[in-house]
From Swiss-Prot:
This is Protein transport protein USE1. Changing residue 183 to G: In USE1-0; slows down protein transport from the endoplasmic reticulum to the Golgi at 37 degrees Celsius. Keywords: Endoplasmic reticulum, ER-Golgi transport, Membrane, Protein transport, Transmembrane, Transmembrane helix, Transport. The keyword Oxidoreductase does not apply. Belongs to the USE1 family. It comes from Saccharomyces cerevisiae (strain ATCC 204508 / S288c). Residues 1-218 are cytoplasmic. SNARE required for targeting and fusion of Golgi-derived retrograde transport vesicles with the ER. CDD domains: SNARE_USE1. Its main location: endoplasmic reticulum. GO terms for biological process: protein transport; retrograde vesicle-mediated transport, Golgi to endoplasmic reticulum; vesicle fusion with endoplasmic reticulum.
């Protein structure tokens, strides 16, 4: 049987706890029923839950629902009573309360205003970064305008410096790209010269294979040597001419 209590909150908590325990028993019974080898046979715990705990679970659920409804109604009554209490004020007693408070604390409003003004001044000093300047009125406004102008000037200087830095970086990137292009041209010319020299060497080696070693004379070796030197000189001249172009 579900436990009853005059306190709806206590009934709600107890019913929730009992429902949690019954839910654990239900899961345990279902797990054993599913894990049993004989599917046609119903386990003892499952039967016990169906005959005993199922009715108790329904009673606890009903008790929990009733307690929740009671708490909702109590909360709505509290809200409505607080609203009516807020607006049900005796207008005749307002003047008396105000006059009494004014007579008892005549300097309270003045002290509050002084505290507010001091707090505002302290906050202004912190924001403006002032030292011990306590001037008010025109001097304070003038100093604030001067600081704003200084900040604007500083921002303009920073913008100009950043623009100059970006321009110099752009010029450096363009110069670096042009240098890379020149190096690419030089490497291309050197590659052409090397290909020409290698082609000449391949031609010479092919011709050498056609002749017999006995037919080669000193004049042929000298001619081959001169041809190799001329090929290297031609490659060097090509490398020197392309950067100038």
């Amino acid at each position: 049987m579900a436990e009853t209590s005059n306190d709806p909150f206590l009934s709600y908590v107890l019913s929730s706890k009992q429902l949690t325990n019954l839910n654990r028993l239900r899961r345990k019974a279902v797990t054993k029923q599913l894990g049993s080898s004989d599917d046609n046979k119903v386990s003892e715990e499952f039967l016990r839950y169906q005959h005993t705990y199922q009715r108790e679970a329904f009673e606890y659920l009903q008790t929990k629902h009733d307690a929740h409804k009671i708490m909702e109604s109590q909360y709505e009554q509290y809200q409505s009573s607080s609203k009516t209490r807020r607006y049900s004020i005796d207008l005749d007693s307002v003047d008396a309360v105000d006059t009494e408070s004014q007579t008892e604390y005549p300097n309270e409003e003045f002290i509050d205003r002084n505290e507010d003004s001091e707090a505002v001044m302290e906050l202004r000093k912190r924001l403006l970064g002032k030292g011990q300047n306590k001037g008010l009125g025109y001097e304070t406004t003038k100093s604030v305008d001067r600081q704003i102008e200084d900040q604007d000037t500083l921002q303009q200087d920073l913008i100009q410096d950043m623009s100059k830095l970006v321009g110099s970086l752009k010029q450096g990137a363009v110069a670096f790209q042009s240098a890379l292009d020149e190096d690419k041209q030089v490497l291309g010319a050197a590659e052409i010269g090397i290909q020409v020299a290698s082609q000449g060497l391949m031609d010479v080696s092919g011709k050498l294979r056609k002749y017999d070693k006995s037919k080669l004379s000193y004049l042929f070796y000298i001619t081959v040597f001169i041809f190799m030197i001329l090929g290297l000189v031609f490659t060097f001249i090509i490398i020197q001419l392309f950067p100038a172009l």
